[in-house]
Amino acid sequence: MTELSVPSQLPAGATPEGDGIAVGDGPVRVDLYIDFLCPFCKQFELGANDVLTSLLGEHQATLVYHPMNFLDEASTTRYSTRASAASGCASDGGRFVEFVHQLFVGQPPEGGAGLSDQEITEIGVSAGVDQAAFASCLGDGRYHEWPTFVTSRAAQAGVEGTPTVRVNGTDIEPDAGSLTAAVQQAQKDS
């Protein structure tokens, strides 16, 4: 696989490597490799949302989301790329975590067109972003290249599917209980 160069435009909150969005300031790093069309990612997000929110609110972890386009072929409109690019627009608007959650709540089934850009914009607005700025970002394709870069970097890091959850570099089962236990263990080990 040829290494892709870092896209010229990265969302606010992007990691220094450009391969994810960092949220929070806690000492334990939790990497979340997700695809917005992945039903198991939705299951993880909905099942672990309270834990993720608590980790952020209590400054226990820095969450690094890696929005991938792993499942682009499972939709007729490259939905994974469009949704991941839109998450970058939401990050610019300071509502990344809220947008991710709302996008998973409204997840379309695999095999179809996915949500339209208008529907994605409505989800962004419900998550609290400015409609005009978000629609402009989405419409001009500002972060359209970014999900392919994120996916390439994830493959180089050994990610073979979504969701992949890593705590301080160690893969764990993608569920709330495993996440809680792994973060607690990482805190003890530090």
Regions found by a protein language model. Give the residues of each.
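C-terminal cap of thioredoxin/glutaredoxin-like
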Residues: 51, 125-190
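Extracytoplasmic/secreted proteins, especially bacterial periplasmic and envelope-associated proteins
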Residues: 43, 47-51, 81-85, 95-98, ...
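Sec-exported extracytoplasmic/periplasmic mature domains
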Residues: 43-46, 53, 57-60, 88-95, ...
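Structural microenvironment flanking redox-active thiols in thiol-disulfide oxidoreductases
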Residues: 55-89, 96-122
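A structure-centric signal for secondary-structure junctions around beta-strands
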Residues: 18, 27, 83, 161-162
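Extracytoplasmic thiol/disulfide redox context detector
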Residues: 1-75, 151, 185-190
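A mature extracytoplasmic/lumenal domain signature
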Residues: 34, 67-69, 103, 138, ...
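Extracytoplasmic/secreted cell-surface and envelope-processing proteins
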Residues: 41, 73-74, 113, 173-176
